[in-house]
């Protein structure tokens, strides 16, 4: 009898344990599925991006995004370490130019099969930024935006100088810049050209853009050598140097912050910077300006552009179901590009660019077409070093009136040396 009672007790305990386990499992699966996420957006960018994440979490009870914002200065160091250690989050933000630091080592997931299986709307993306995230024919990231260099124009200064049309050729730009200075006493062409505050990336971006406008390329097709020591590079650098040295439409030693403030305060006519400057400029009272794609001053429209992308770290045990959840989040974030456009960036979704919400944003519609003519940096792991080094060399060439051929020879040798180390 005692053994029988003990047996009944054991059976009861086993049943209770099973019930508790089942209840725990149900509790675990009944809650939302979590997608962890790292971003690098702070300040104004961070506020707009966080609003998209909040909206996703409000409208998706089954999936929740858990976002960890990392300061930009530390972001890629932390990301590189996490990917190498295998403890990266489920989803990451990565600049298009940085993708190649992780793709060759298999640290990012190839998305093609997952995109097809989940009917991801790839046809709704502008082709250029989408294709810039492909390597060896495979899609490794989805572009969130493009942020090309564009031209800002002070319309009041043009009116005071009697200029009716925005210049479309280099000769017109120079002539109008000179006229602005003669008629108004203001700066004609506003391009920063010193590393005093911030690297002179604007020079590299314009040098890059002018080469592509002529039909050239910055590097060879295989990205193994410089390709600008030719007539395209000569003409591009000559134009930038002449603005400072020959025509005096741009002062030498103009730093990034001063260049921004000169235009912001109405003291410059033609200002070149990325789309990210729009948010700051539109807050300036009584500044009557337009923001447009860089005209094809040297041929066809083409402009340097960066791009924030969304990628999925490759993990050994990642399930197709979890990838589906991540793609759901990516679809939502890119599909709400009108919210992100408030930070100045150009959406990559065609439906967003055609939406009323985007059209109603001031200035953005004026440069939305720049996405189609945006040119991404070459897909080489050496690009970051090339980018910074060329900015220094271009600064020296422009500010010191270095002979053009000498400057191109020096840049070519330096770039080829950098590439050889990768």
What label would you give each PLM region?
Residues 55-125, 134, 159-168, 262, ...:
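Extracytoplasmic "Venus flytrap"/periplasmic binding protein-like
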Residues 116, 271, 277-286, 297-392, ...:
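C-terminal lobe and pocket-closing loops
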Residues 64, 159, 242-245, 369-422:
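Conserved C-terminal helix/tail region of periplasmic/extracytoplasmic solute-binding proteins
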Residues 112-125, 193-197, 201, 212-235, ...:
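Short, solvent-exposed loop/beta-turn-alpha elements that line the ligand-binding surface or hinge
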Residues 176-179, 222-252:
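Glycine-centered hinge/linker elements that transmit conformational signals in sensory
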Residues 99-107, 112, 128-166, 193-222, ...:
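Periplasmic solute-binding protein
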Residues 1-36, 58, 353-361, 409, ...:
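Short, low-complexity disordered leader/linker segments with a strong preference
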Residues 23, 96-150, 174-176, 182-184, ...:
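Hinge/lid segment of periplasmic solute-binding proteins
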